């Protein structure tokens, strides 16, 4: 009888200890309401705190403790998360693309949709960067961010409670209970989780680097949550802007395509699948669905800032384009481009067969029938209701909303500017540099020379590397020089 009483007492004690630990460390708390839609997109939770969230104070000091692992090492101009290209408003607690939400009593910082879908621009070298909400991630280096976290976790000398808590103490004095949780649970737990990430992302080392402004969007999903064996495919492609996606809504019963290759034909499913890819599970979906619906509504309506290229400004301005060039360029656009790139065009947001468009095929081959079927049936214990995953044979004719902010061009960012997009592929640059956010007033897009921008981190693009081919999309390449200048003038205003 005494044994059973002791055993029962032990079970009750264990139950209360477990419940206390859950309430303290794991019970999801509601994120404070974010009223402004832009701020919500930039900082709202997508339900991935339990899988991707880093305890706030660890997240806060990692770039300081491991500054030598930042993309530019100790010479980086900023020993914080802006080293990876994210925009950080002065006075904001978090950079764009990060969400803060508590599990139990501990705030966690997690990436959200905006970590890839944000942009910035400068109209001159000395002007301040301007945030572009939901924009093409032209400054972001997701692979460098991933590798930084892995290298930090692998550093046995510094990723430990003594070093990290010493760094935290430079910013705040944690209560004794919280310091103990960080020392004995959160720091070793975060290290262990990141080391698992290191193992999960080993496949990256055998493939070409993504580079600034690009990502391999679905191989991490294939080899991770879908548990498909790593293959030789390369998915490197530019991070698309999420603007005016109401234009991708079904029209006259016909579904329109989303993603570069049209692997989905439903915007809401795209939002949910994206959150899953970033770590949301069915366990957190119920508390996150309202947020995802808000994101769905937001990206269907948001527009980019208007182009600075205009005809009604001082002719001495580098952004001046003549009314005559605009008129001639618009006619050429209607004749050569509008059937694919305008909402009323017959091929708008339709998949153009790879044999016709002729651009690099690697991104297309990365998405397989096996991946499609596994994503449709992801997590057998929960019915996500996915109905619109596809496997296509080409790339989507997307709208040109905010074209001036999308450079470099083509799905893999292999053409530096609009002027060279109108050249025959054989004449396009084989080497250029991306990462600048200074608008190229001469050529459209962003500056792409090795030394054009001293303030930005620049990445060398070599179009001979697998996945980087600048072939294809020959529309407009047979125009006369004068016609190309007129079309270029018009495209700059898009």
Predicted regions and their residues:
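Short, Lys/Arg-rich N-terminal segment immediately upstream of the first membrane anchor
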Residues: 1-5
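Periplasmic c-type cytochrome electron-transfer domains
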Residues: 6-10, 16-494
């Amino acid at each position: 009888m005494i044994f059973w009483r002791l055993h029962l007492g032990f079970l009750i004690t264990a139950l209360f200890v477990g419940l206390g630990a859950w309430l303290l460390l794991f019970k999801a708390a509601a994120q404070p309401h974010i009223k402004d839609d832009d701020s919500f997109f930039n900082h709202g939770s997508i339900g991935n705190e339990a899988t991707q969230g880093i305890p706030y104070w660890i997240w806060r000091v990692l770039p300081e403790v491991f500054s030598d692992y930042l993309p530019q090492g100790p010479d980086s101009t900023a020993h914080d998360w802006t080293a990876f290209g994210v925009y950080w408003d002065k006075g904001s607690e978090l950079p764009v693309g990060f969400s803060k939400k508590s599990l139990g009593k501990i705030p966690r910082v997690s990436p959200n949709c905006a970590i890839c879908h944000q942009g910035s621009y400068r109209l001159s070298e000395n002007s301040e960067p301007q945030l572009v909400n939901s924009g093409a991630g032209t400054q972001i280096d997701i692979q460098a961010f991933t590798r930084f976290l892995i290298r930090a976790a692998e550093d046995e000398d510094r990723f430990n409670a003594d070093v990290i808590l010493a760094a935290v103490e430079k910013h705040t004095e944690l209560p004794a209970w919280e310091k103990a949780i960080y020392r004995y649970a959160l720091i070793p737990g975060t290290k262990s989780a990141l080391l698992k990430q290191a193992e999960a992302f080993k496949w990256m080392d055998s493939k070409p680097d993504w580079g600034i402004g690009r990502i391999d969007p679905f191989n991490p999903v294939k080899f991770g949550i879908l548990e498909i064996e790593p293959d030789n495919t390369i998915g490197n492609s530019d991070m698309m802007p999420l603007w005016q996606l109401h234009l991708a809504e079904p029209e006259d019963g016909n579904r329109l395509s989303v993603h570069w290759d049209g692997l989905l034909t439903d915007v809401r499913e795209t939002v949910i699948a994206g959150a899953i890819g970033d770590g949301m599970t069915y366990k957190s979906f119920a508390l996150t669905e309202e947020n995802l619906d808000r994101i769905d509504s937001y990206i269907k309506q948001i527009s980019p800032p208007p182009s600075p290229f205009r005809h009604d400004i001082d002719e001495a301005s580098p952004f001046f384009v003549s009314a005559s060039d605009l008129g001639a360029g618009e006619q050429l656009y209607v004749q050569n481009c509008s059937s694919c790139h305008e909402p009323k065009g017959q091929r708008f947001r339709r998949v153009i067969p790879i044999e016709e468009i002729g651009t690099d095929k690697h991104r297309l081959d990365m998405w397989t029938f096996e991946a499609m079927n596994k994503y449709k049936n992801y997590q057998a214990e929960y019915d996500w209701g996915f109905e619109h995953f596809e496997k296509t044979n080409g790339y989507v004719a997307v709208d040109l909303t905010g074209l001036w902010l999308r450079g470099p061009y083509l799905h893999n960012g292999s053409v530096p500017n609009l002027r060279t997009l109108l050249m025959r592929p054989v004449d396009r640059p084989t080497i250029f540099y991306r990462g600048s956010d200074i608008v190229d007033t001469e050529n459209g897009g962003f500056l792409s020379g090795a030394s054009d921008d001293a303030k930005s981190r620049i990445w060398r693009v070599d179009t001979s590397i697998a996945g980087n081919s600048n072939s294809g999309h020959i529309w407009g390449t047979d125009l006369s020089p004068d016609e190309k200048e007129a079309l270029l003038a018009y495209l700059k205003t898009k």
